[in-house]
Amino acid sequence: MRSLLLLTVLAALAVLTVCYESHESMESYEISPFLNRRNANTFMSPQQRWRAKAQERVRERSKPAYELNREACDDYKLCERYAMLYGYNAAYNRYFRKRRGAE
């Protein structure tokens, strides 16, 4: 009986120590971690935003051929479904490569 009581007390202490939530373990003290649309970009300075937009324009201009092919395939539902099974290269070749050769 004594060992059962001791085991119960030890189990209760183990549960209390494991389930204890300290304030140090919290990831964020904020009530809501999400921002509304109006305040979403206030943490970036205008110069950083301009630089990010300029870099995005450069990336858009200098995309590799496989990325352009993938975007063309993403816009066409049948090509996208075929790509899920056989890959984007095979899907692009099936739906778009023949059309280019015919023109």
UniProtKB/Swiss-Prot annotation:
The record ties this protein, via SUPFAM superfamilies, to: GLA-domain (SSF57630)
Where is it located?
Answer: Secreted
**Disulphides:** C73-C79
> Which domain of life, per UniProt?
Eukaryota
- Modified positions (4-carboxyglutamate) in chain numbering: E21, E56, E60, E67, E71
Domain Gla positions: 51-97
This entry's Gene Ontology molecular function terms read: calcium ion binding
Q: How is it modified after translation?
A: Requires vitamin K-dependent gamma-carboxylation for its function.
**Which protein family is it in?**
Belongs to the osteocalcin/matrix Gla protein family.
Function recorded in the entry: Associates with the organic matrix of bone and cartilage. Thought to act as an inhibitor of bone formation.
Name of protein: Matrix Gla protein
Q: Which organism is it from?
A: Chinchilla lanigera
Tell me the organism's taxonomic lineage: Eukaryota, Metazoa, Chordata, Craniata, Vertebrata
Name the gene.
MGP
